[in-house]
Curated annotation (Swiss-Prot):
PANTHER family: DIMETHYLANILINE MONOOXYGENASE. It is found in: Microsome membrane; Endoplasmic reticulum membrane. It is a single-pass membrane protein. It holds the Pfam family FMO-like. FAD binds at G9, A10, G11, V12, S13, E32, L40, W41, N61, S62. This is Flavin-containing monooxygenase 3. Essential hepatic enzyme that catalyzes the oxygenation of a wide variety of nitrogen- and sulfur-containing compounds including drugs as well as dietary compounds. Plays an important role in the metabolism of trimethylamine (TMA), via the production of trimethylamine N-oxide (TMAO) metabolite. TMA is generated by the action of gut microbiota using dietary precursors such as choline, choline containing compounds, betaine or L-carnitine. By regulating TMAO concentration, FMO3 directly impacts both platelet responsiveness and rate of thrombus formation.
Length: 531
C-alpha cells in the first residue's frame, strides 16, 4: 500500500514535492489555499492574508538556465531574467506537462496538523483542512510543508521611536503593487534588500524624492556580469567554489570584495556593508547606482526617530515632509497550523537538519521544503530537497541519530555566522549544499570520473555554470537529456538576445579565471629569474 503524503502549498516547492513523491512511489495530496499554482510568483493586484505577495514589476534575480526544474528547461525564446508573469507561465507549464494538477486540492486551507496518538510508532499525522466553510480531517503517513516563507511580514515598528506620531502613510513592502499612487511624493524606504531597492528605484521615476535607510549596507550586484553574460552563469561555478573554499581567507576575502566592487565602488554610493567580507546574499539591482547618480535616490543610515512629518537619521540629518514610509524589512517564518515547538525546537529559532527535517521527531515523517536561502536559485534547491525528503519518507534514505543531527545543526550554525553573519534566515553555500543533498540520494556527479569518461562534459560541469541539469546526470531520477542540456546551456542563454544578428554566438572562455590565476605564479617565476 502506498504511503500517503500531505503537501502544503502548490508553489515551486510544492510542485517539486508532488513530483518527487510520485517518483518514489508515494501518494501525494497537495492542499493549496488559492485557485492556482505558482505561490509567490502568482501575481495579484491585492494582498491576501496568509498568501505571499509580489509587486507588478518583479523580475527574477536568477537566470533561466540556473533556475529551472532540472529536467525541464525553459523555452529557447524565454529571456534570461523573466518578468513574474513569464515565470508563472513556466510553472504552470511544468505542472501541466508533469501531470501534477490532479493531485492538488485548490482553495483549500490547512488549519491544523497534529501528531496522531500513535505517532511514536507510526509517524502519522492528522491534517485538518477547510474548504467552502467545511472542515475535514484526514490521516497521512507524512507531511511536506512547502509554504510559510514570504508570507508573514516582519514589521519592526517598535524599533523606531516616534513612528506612532508619524502622520503619513506607513506599510510593509508586501502591500506595494505599483508606483502610480506616489507620483510627486516624498518616500522613505526602510531596508536595503531586493524589494527595498526595486521599489525605491521604481518610485524614483515618479516620486519627488526617495530615500533608502539602511542599518548595515549591502553589496549591490548587476544581473549583467563579465562581458554581458548572466551573473550566475559566470559566478556560480564549481571552480569558483573550489577556490573560495580552499584559498587562504585573506585572499578569498580580497577576491570576493574585488568582484563586488567591479561595477562601482560601494563606499562612494553609501552602500558599503559594515562587514564586507560576509557572504550575505547581495542585492540584485541594475538601476539603483544610476538612480543614485541622478540624485533621485539617496542612501541614509538607520532612522533614529520619527516626527509627525519627518525622519531623523543616526547621522543627524533629517528627511522632511515625508508622505510615505515603506518597510522593506523582510519576512518571518510562521506555520500557524503547526505547534511551534516542532519547527522551532530551540531558543525559538528554526531548528532543522539540513534546513529540512525537525531533528527531535520520533519518526522522520515531516519535511520543510524551500526554507533554505543561498546565492543559488530556489527551484533546483527545492527539487533536490524534495527528492531527498521523499526518499527519507519512503525509507530508502536513513537520517542520523538525534544527537548527530543536532551536532550538525550546531556546526552549520557556526559556519553560517562566519560566512553570512547573524541572520534569522537559513543561509548556506549553494554548490556545497546541493552536492551534499545530491550525495544523500546518489545524484552527485563524480567530476574526476567525468574527466576520464567524458572530458568535454567534465570541463563544462567543473568550469561552467553549476546548472540544475548536473543533478539529474546520475542516480535516481536520472534524466537522459541532462548531458545535452549542459552542453547547450549557453546556446539557450544567448538565443533570446540574437534579435539582430551581427555575428556568431560568442560563448565565454571557461578557462578564463584559471588562466588568470595561472598567470600569477608565472609572473612571480619570471620576476625571480630576471633578478
Amino acid at each position: 500500500m502506498k504511503r500517503k503524503v500531505a503537501v502544503i502549498g502548490a508553489g515551486v516547492s510544492g510542485l517539486a514535492a508532488i513530483r518527487s513523491c510520485l517518483e518514489e512511489g508515494l501518494e501525494p495530496t497537495c492542499f493549496e489555499r488559492s485557485d492556482d499554482v505558482g505561490g509567490l510568483w502568482k501575481f495579484s493586484d491585492h494582498t491576501e492574508e496568509g498568501r505571499a505577495s509580489i509587486y507588478q514589476s518583479v523580475f527574477t534575480n536568477s537566470s533561466k538556465e540556473m533556475m529551472c526544474f532540472p529536467d525541464f528547461p525553459y523555452p529557447d525564446d524565454f529571456p534570461n531574467f523573466m518578468h513574474n508573469s513569464k515565470l508563472q507561465e513556466y510553472i504552470t507549464s511544468f505542472a501541466t506537462e508533469k501531470n501534477l494538477l490532479k493531485y492538488i486540492q485548490f482553495e483549500t486551507l490547512v488549519t491544523r496538523i497534529n501528531k496522531c496518538p500513535d505517532f511514536s510508532t507510526t509517524g502519522k499525522w492528522e491534517v485538518t483542512t477547510e474548504k467552502n466553510s467545511k472542515k475535514e480531517t484526514a490521516v497521512f503517513d507524512a507531511v511536506m510543508i512547502c509554504s510559510g516563507h514570504h508570507v508573514y511580514p516582519h514589521l519592526p515598528k517598535d524599533s523606531f521611536p516616534g513612528l506612532n506620531r508619524f502622520k503619513g502613510k506607513c506599510f510593509h513592502s508586501r502591500d506595494y503593487k505599483e508606483p502610480g499612487t506616489w507620483k510627486g511624493k516624498r518616500v522613505l524606504v526602510i531596508g536595503l534588500g531586493n524589494s527595498g531597492c526595486d521599489i525605491a528605484a521604481e518610485l524614483s521615476h515618479v516620486a519627488q524624492q526617495v530615500i533608502i535607510s539602511s542599518r548595515s549596507g549591502s553589496w549591490v550586484m548587476s544581473r549583467v556580469w563579465n562581458d554581458g553574460y548572466p551573473w550566475d552563469m559566470v559566478v556560480i561555478t564549481r571552480f569558483q567554489t573550489f577556490l573560495k573554499n580552499n584559498l587562504p581567507t585573506a585572499i578569498s576575502d580580497w577576491w570576493y570584495m574585488k568582484q563586488m566592487n567591479a561595477r562601482f565602488k560601494h563606499e562612494n554610493y553609501g552602500l558599503m556593508p559594515l562587514n564586507g567580507t560576509l557572504r550575505k546574499e547581495p542585492v540584485f539591482n541594475d538601476e539603483l547606482p544610476a538612480r543614485i547618480l541622478c540624485g533621485t535616490v539617496s542612501i541614509k543610515p538607520n532612522v533614529k526617530e520619527f516626527t509627525e512629518t519627518s525622519a531623523v537619521f543616526e547621522d543627524g540629518t533629517v528627511f522632511e515632509g515625508i508622505d510615505c514610509v515603506i518597510f522593506a524589512t523582510g519576512y518571518g517564518y510562521a506555520y500557524p497550523f503547526l505547534d511551534d515547538s516542532i519547527i522551532k525546537s530551540r531558543n525559538n529559532e528554526v531548528t532543522l537538519y539540513k534546513g529540512i527535517f525537525p531533528p527531535q521527531l520520533e519518526k522522520p515523517t515531516m519535511a520543510v521544503i524551500g526554507l533554505v536561502q543561498s546565492l543559488g536559485a530556489a527551484i533546483p534547491t527545492t527539487d533536490l530537497q524534495a527528492r531527498w525528503a521523499a526518499q527519507v519518507i519512503r525509507g530508502t534514505c536513513i537520517l542520523p541519530s538525534v544527537n548527530d543531527m543536532m551536532d550538525d545543526i550546531d556546526e552549520k550554525m557556526g559556519k553560517k555566522l562566519k560566512w553570512f553573519g547573524n541572520s534569522t534566515t537559513i543561509q548556506t553555500d549553494y554548490i556545497v549544499y546541493m552536492d551534499e543533498l545530491a550525495s544523500f540520494i546518489g545524484a552527485k556527479p563524480n567530476i574526476l570520473w567525468l574527466f576520464l569518461k567524458d572530458p568535454r562534459l567534465a570541463i563544462e560541469v567543473f568550469f561552467g555554470p553549476c546548472s540544475p541539469y548536473q543533478f539529474r546526470l546520475v542516480g535516481p531520477g536520472k534524466w537522459s537529456g541532462a548531458r545535452n542540456a549542459i552542453l547547450t546551456q549557453w546556446d539557450r542563454s544567448l538565443k533570446p538576445m540574437k534579435t539582430r544578428v551581427v555575428g556568431g554566438i560568442q560563448k565565454p572562455c571557461l578557462y578564463s579565471h584559471f588562466l588568470r590565476l595561472l598567470a600569477v605564479p608565472v609572473l612571480i617565476a619570471l620576476f625571480l629569474v630576471l633578478i
